[in-house]
Amino acid sequence: MKAIPLDKSNVKLLGRALVRDDILRRTLSGTGCEFVFTGCRLTLTVGVDADCHNDGKRCNMPRIAVLCDGRIIVKKVVEERAERFDVVSSDAPETHTVRIVKLSEGAFSLAEVSHAEVDDGAVIAPTAEKPLKIEFIGDSITCGYGVDDSNMQSEFSCEAENAMKSYACVAAELLVADYSLFSYSGYGLISGYSADGERNTREILPRRYESCGFSYSSVDGTKLQDIPWDFSAFVPNVVVLNLGTNDNSFCTFHNEAYREFEDEYLSFLRVIRRCNPNAHIICSLGIMLTEPLPYIENAVRRLGDDRVSVFRYTTQDGLLGFGSNWHPSEDTHRRAGEELAAYVRSIL
């Protein structure tokens, strides 16, 4: 057996995953890697980052999945610095497609893949790039928060998150697209979630967009928000923006703030366009609420870019159930993903 670091030479990185010091860091929702394995034995070593491990709060520990040929063989919360998972064990060489995905978001913890252990004759190679690439920018809905928990009164826990079931990953799968998610629970444009009308300035997404993300954990002492993102690493054909739900919690207390939301939405669209000059930008909303939509439409009109459009999802009404804290259920995410995929097909 031999140990092989996983990096861009032998795997396809998913989302804004980082490789530093021969360790693959899965940061944001949906990040990870995918590769084709040919050999007899494959064991992966995965761990939680040191900061989160030392903190010891299980609700913040990363949740991950390992898939072999599309079948989930591991789905769990990672609580240790190093946990080993046997993926392939055979007497004769076999070929399999393996995907390692972080199901939970990046704010509270990172998941690390230190290496793969394989038999001496084994080969690991990246899977092929898909012709369509989509970036999704959003909040807890895009993270898939609550989709694996039907208790509407649950306290926040990363264990309730499953990015693979989010509308974003559903749409990407239907469109046979590579995806990148940039999403954080509670985040907005002018205010993060507010239960009392006080402006939440801690959770503002645009200030993080041009970095590798945000996390209370660090990568070898460096915060994600201090690492610039290289936009040439993933060049999307489509960018889907799904923000406004958390801003609405603030704006309902301060009706005049909707105009500020519109101005900031316009400013962020200009940032997205600068970073993604050739992408079609879809400004979407509606899975949980629709009040900010007129202001989003105004911002798009003011931008005057014919490759920016507005899309409205069917709003949840409870008939398909709810996840944690009134978040969308798996069936609601499936419906939204199907709606979005159909819209993307119509504009490309």
Cite the ranges covered by each PLM segment.
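Short, conserved loop/helix-junction motifs that constitute active-site signature segments
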Residues: E129, F234, R273-N276
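Conserved SGNH/GDSL esterase-like catalytic core that processes O-acyl groups on lipids
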Residues: L28-G30, V147, Q153-N255, R259, ...
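Catalytic His-Asp segment of secreted/periplasmic serine-dependent ester chemistry enzymes
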Residues: I287-L348
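N-terminal secretory targeting modules
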Residues: M1-I137, I141-A163
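Aromatic/hydrophobic pocket-lining residues that form the small-molecule binding cavity
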Residues: F261, Y265, H333
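Proline-centered flexible-loop/turn and helix-kink motifs
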Residues: P277-N278, G304
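Structural recognition of the beta-strand scaffold that forms the well-ordered cores
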Residues: K133-I137, T142, Y179-S183, N237-N242, ...
